[in-house]
Each structure stands twice: as structure tokens, then as C-alpha cells.
Amino acid sequence: MTEVDDGCGGRLRGSVLLEDECDLKQECETPTHSLVQGRDPPVVVVWRNVVLMSVLHTAAVYGLVLLPSASAYTLLAFCFVSSALGITAGAHRLWSHRSYKASLPLRIFLAVANSMGFQNDIYEWARDHRVHHKYSETDADPHNASRGFFFAHIGWLLVKKHPKVIENGQKLELSDLKNDRVVMFQRRFYKHSVVVMCFLIPAMLPWFLWAESLWVGYFVPVLLRYALVLNATWLVNSAAHMWGNQPYDVNINPRENRFVTFSAIGEGFHNYHHTFPYDYATSEFGCRLNLTTCFINLMCVLGLAKDCRRVPTELVMARVKRTGDGSHRSG
């Protein structure tokens, strides 16, 4: 079995996975052609979501207008990064892919940060993401990019899920999530945690610490920040499935997109990620333009994370030569 140093004080297993990891890997990597496409059912618009998203983005534009008068820029950045890490390091890399192990304090922090991000609870987010990987670009993909940019970006949230998304989501093995006390606690109290973490605390802190008006505090660190994090995440589903190069596998839609990488703190190395979904860094290049990987590495140094799973360089290069588009550049 090939082992390399993981940079987290342990040994990585390369592409060789333990039995329970093989089950998760299979859930994420079944070929998409195994799903037979049929006639699309009628699209049912969820008008409540249309109204809420319209109001949110209108309020975010107003937040931009108020931005010059705001004093809590540091808090705005902190809330953006914190809520983004709750998605990227938490719901995505830890709970969807189990690409590293986190201690209880770190899992609690990531669950709290995930509630600040307000993109469905961890259980639902991870379930839908596993379906996305297993049936990417098919009717069972929640944000199927073959239906166009708008649908992949935000449209999928404005209509009822395709029946195949629900059907195939119910078939997944999710016992690891069900057995995680932090995940299930957050799911049970999700609405309460969102009210506190996404809306109350980011609005109240500027008022309490910097005498910022509650009006500015609500529209800038709350609504503007929330809309920015949402769109950064959505760009991974839309732009990173449409524009960019494919140095690792030209046979799949996901691309390497630098703008998305910067916006989503490291999630834009998407061709690599869909080729090697169990790699904790989601990139061949470690911390480069990858704040999430830097955060996980720091947690390893502090003893709060371990067993980061990484793909050996020789396997990456073999895949580049076999299925890449020729655009790969080392280093």
C-alpha cells in the first residue's frame, strides 16, 4: 500500500482506502451514465423562494450602497470567511467527503460556522452533495449544469427538486452522518442556530463594538455578506462546471476556474476535485489560492484535525497523461 506524509502528523493512504472509506468513495464516484435519463417532469416554481431570493439580492445591493458608511469591515471579512469555512471545510470537505478527521471542538466550530452560512443543515447539504458527485450532470444532480448556467447557479433553488434527485438521495448510505452527534444536533436546532448565527450576531456585534447603526449592521455584515457567500458557493456549481481548463479529466464537465477558486476560498480547482474527490485539499497545489486548505493545515498543527487524505503525485500525473486536456502545469 502506497503511503506518503500527510502534513498533519500522520500517514496518508494515497488512493488505497479502508473498507468504510471505500463505501463513501463508491457513493461519490459511480459513473453518471448508470442513470437512465427520461422525460423531464413539469417544472414547479417555488414562489416563496423566488420572493425571498429576490428580496435578499435587492437588500444586498442596498448593502453595497451603505458599504462606504460602514466601519466594521474587519467583521464583514471575518463573517464572510467564517461562514464560508462552515461550508467548504465543514459541510464539503469534512462531512460530504470525509477527507480528513476533525476533533469535537473543531466539528462544533464548523457546525456553528455552517449555520452562519445558512445553506441547509450539514446533513442535507452533504446528502445532496454526494448525489451531485454520484450523478453529476444528470437529472439526479440537484444543480445539474447541463440545464444551463442559471439553473446550476440559483435556479435549482427556485423550483422543486427533480424526482430523481429525491429518489437517488434516499438510496445513499448516510450512516456516518446519522451517527455524528454534532451533525444531528445541528439538524435538530438548525432554524434556531441560523437566526442567531446568520442574522442576530453579525448585526449586533458592530453595534456593540463599534457603535455601528443596527441598520448598517443588518444590511452589510448580514444580508450583503450572506448574499456574497451564497453566490461564491453557487459559482462552484455553475461557472466551475462550464468555464476553465480540464487538466486532469477531459471526459467530465467540471473545470479549473481561478475566479471561482478565489471567490470560494479554494473550491475552484473543480476538475481536480471531481477526479479525486477524496483529497482534502481539493487541489494538487496545497495552499495556493486555497484558504480552506490553509485552515485545515492550521487545525492539524493545533492538533484539532488529522488523517488528511491526499493523492500521491505519481497517481495525479498518471491521470493527467491519460485523460487530461494537455493544459496541466506542475508547480
From Swiss-Prot:
Job description of the protein: Stearoyl-CoA desaturase that utilizes O(2) and electrons from reduced cytochrome b5 to introduce the first double bond into saturated fatty acyl-CoA substrates. Catalyzes the insertion of a cis double bond at the delta-9 position into fatty acyl-CoA substrates including palmitoyl-CoA and stearoyl-CoA. Contributes to the biosynthesis of membrane phospholipids, cholesterol esters and triglycerides.
Species for this entry: Tachysurus fulvidraco (Yellow catfish)
Coiled-coil regions, chain positions: none
GO cellular component, one term: endoplasmic reticulum membrane
Cofactor or coenzyme needed: Fe(2+)
EC number: 1.14.19.1
Annotated positions binding Fe cation 1: H92, H97, H129, H133, H273
PROSITE patterns per UniProt: FATTY_ACID_DESATUR_1
Main localization (coarse): endoplasmic reticulum
Residues exposed to the Lumenal side: 68-71, 210-213
Gene name, Swiss-Prot/TrEMBL: SCD1
Protein name as annotated: Acyl-CoA desaturase 1
